[in-house]
């Protein structure tokens, strides 16, 4: 998509202001995330698709600049965790509108990305976005992650599993860790998170065969909202997850794991 191109969103045409595009590029540069002109164009077009989509509520804002600078940029921040840049197979758990999976697919064209989303209308949007952007090497799985993680095609198959705005850390651990190969990483994208949630997440990870590897602060330039705290919580899988996990659909959220199992 050439700069300035608009995407129609019903009665109104959407476009991203030049100032927002430039701030987006500067933040990527500050993070050391390389993006070609074509990749930047695809990321902008994706933001416009999110802002303009009307068939389902896939995102909470209709402002293209907000979508680009908060949601798409937030997704790209996962690449501050450098091992992710070399991941060959990535799962986006609870993908929603494709965040962070679609931006990461654009920035990591060689990676195989699987978007796991249980809501049918959101899965429809994901397929629409993939087709509209001309992406390959990215698939949509319309199912609960608790079921997906028990399938041989997905269990212990991923180098990385990502989750953004899905659930508390102990719940995310049970969703993500069973998908990982030993040595793989779960990346939980968090804003403000109380210390007790981190400790509970660490205990849940241990039950699942993983450990808390680190917490990365996400620095932001003033023009993209430096006051908005973001953190990446990293779990590393050290051994195979016991076969009883994840538990049946809905149970991880209702009864989150604790360190005792």
Swiss-Prot record:
Coiled coil: none annotated. Its main location: cytoplasm. It comes from the Bacteria. One of its GO terms (molecular function) is rRNA (guanine-N7-)-methyltransferase activity. GO terms for cellular component: cytosol. Its EC number is 2.1.1.-. Belongs to the methyltransferase superfamily. RNA methyltransferase RsmG family. Specifically methylates the N7 position of a guanine in 16S rRNA. NCBIfam families: rsmG_gidB. This is Ribosomal RNA small subunit methyltransferase G. The lineage of its organism: Bacteria, Bacillati, Actinomycetota, Rubrobacteria, Rubrobacterales.
């Amino acid at each position: 998509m050439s700069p300035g191109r608009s995407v129609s969103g019903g009665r109104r045409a959407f476009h991203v202001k030049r100032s927002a595009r430039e701030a987006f590029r500067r933040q990527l540069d500050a993070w050391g995330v390389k993006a070609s002109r074509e990749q930047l164009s695809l990321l902008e077009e994706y933001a416009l698709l999110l802002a303009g989509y009307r068939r389902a509520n896939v995102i909470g804002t209709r402002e293209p600049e907000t979508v680009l600078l908060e949601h798409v940029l937030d997704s790209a921040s996962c690449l501050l965790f450098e091992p992710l840049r070399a991941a060959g197979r990535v799962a986006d758990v609870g993908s929603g509108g494709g965040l962070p999976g679609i931006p990461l697919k654009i920035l990591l064209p060689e990676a195989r990305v699987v978007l796991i989303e249980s809501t049918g209308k959101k899965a429809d949007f994901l397929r629409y976005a993939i087709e509209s952007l001309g992406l390959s090497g990215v698939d949509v799985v319309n199912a609960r992650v608790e079921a997906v993680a028990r399938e041989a095609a997905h269990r212990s198959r991923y180098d990385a599993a990502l989750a953004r705005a899905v659930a508390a850390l102990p719940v995310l651990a049970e969703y993500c860790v069973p998908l990982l190969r030993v040595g793989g990483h779960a990346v939980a994208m968090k804003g403000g998170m109380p210390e007790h949630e981190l400790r509970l997440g660490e205990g849940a990870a241990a039950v699942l065969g993983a450990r808390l590897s680190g917490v990365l602060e996400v620095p932001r330039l003033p023009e993209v909202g430096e006051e908005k705290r973001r953190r990446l919580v990293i779990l590393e899988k050290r051994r195979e997850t016991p076969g009883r996990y994840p538990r049946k659909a809905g149970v991880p959220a209702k009864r989150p794991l604790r360190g005792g199992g």
